[in-house]
Design a protein with these regions (language model features):
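Short aromatic-glycine-(Arg/Gly/Cys) micro-motifs in beta-strand/loop hairpins
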Residues: 25-51, 66-67, 78
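A short, charged, amphipathic alpha-helix used as a generic interaction element across diverse proteins
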Residues: 47, 56-73
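A positively charged, amphipathic N-terminal helix/segment that binds anionic biomolecules
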Residues: 19-20, 75, 79-80
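A generic structural signal for ordered alpha-helices
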Residues: 3-6, 15, 39, 43-46, ...
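Generic preference for hydrophobic/aromatic residues in regular secondary structure cores
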Residues: 9-10, 59, 77-79
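Short N-terminal "domain-start" leader segments
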Residues: 1-36
Length: 80
């Protein structure tokens, strides 16, 4: 599995609560030989916020991506 092969787009929609959110996860190489898990989240239609989590090894980065995806799935986010 290579970085960049597994971008995930998760959405959570609940019209009764006026909720329309997205969560995007991707693993990307950094300029210095490491890897970053890029998380972007917010309301659909906005730029959202972004956070980078840095890792020295691609397997650690991919494991972190899957851990976050599992947490979001438990909170009601679904893959798109």
């Amino acid at each position: 599995m290579e970085p960049g092969d597994t971008p995930l787009l998760l959405k959570r929609v609940d019209p009764a609560r006026n909720m329309n959110r997205f969560y995007h996860l991707s693993v990307e190489p950094t300029l210095f030989g490491g890897f970053a898990v890029r998380r972007t989240w917010g309301r659909v239609g906005t730029w959202g916020r972004t956070r980078l989590d840095l890792f020295a090894d691609v397997t650690l980065a991919l494991a972190h991506q899957q851990k976050i995806a599992a947490q979001k799935h438990r909170r009601g986010y679904c893959p798109q």
